[in-house]
Amino acid sequence: MSDDVALPLEFTEAAANKVKHLIADEDNPNLKLRVYITGGGCSGFQYGFTFDDQVNEGDMTIEKQGVGLVVDPMSLQYLVGGSVDYTEGLEGSRFIVTNPNAKSTCGCGSSFSV
């Protein structure tokens, strides 16, 4: 997708850079980072991340730095207006989702309710 089109989900430079390095380590340029939402966690829904070389019908792909972030339509409806970022700190390193649709989140930030 073009950089001048408003996207429903932001894929940050830090996240794209980390994905680029992880894909290089796997030696499979077809891999993309898939973010998804499942039921569970202490707040009702939880975020999940996996590498996937498949893009399914209806999936949205956001390209940055030559790598892709893939989101299925069911998950996207809960993520609109949010961002996928990557952080490194005292708590470790991880991909994180900032979700303006979440009414509450758990302490670790991996689950939420709407």
From Swiss-Prot:
Protein's recorded name: Iron-sulfur cluster insertion protein ErpA
Cofactor note: Binds 1 iron-sulfur cluster per subunit.
InterPro entries: FeS_biogenesis, FeS_cluster_insertion, FeS_cluster_insertion_CS, FeS_cluster_insertion_RrpA, HesB-like_dom_sf
Pfam family name, one: Fe-S_biosyn
UniProt xrefs under NCBIfam families: iron-sulfur cluster assembly accessory protein, PRK13623.1
Alphabetized PANTHER family for the sequence: IRON-SULFUR CLUSTER ASSEMBLY 2 HOMOLOG, MITOCHONDRIAL
Binding site for iron-sulfur cluster: C42, C106, C108
Subunit structure and binding partners: Homodimer.
Family matches, as HAMAP family: Fe_S_insert_ErpA
GO cellular component: cytosol
Recorded family membership: Belongs to the HesB/IscA family.
BP terms from Gene Ontology: iron-sulfur cluster assembly
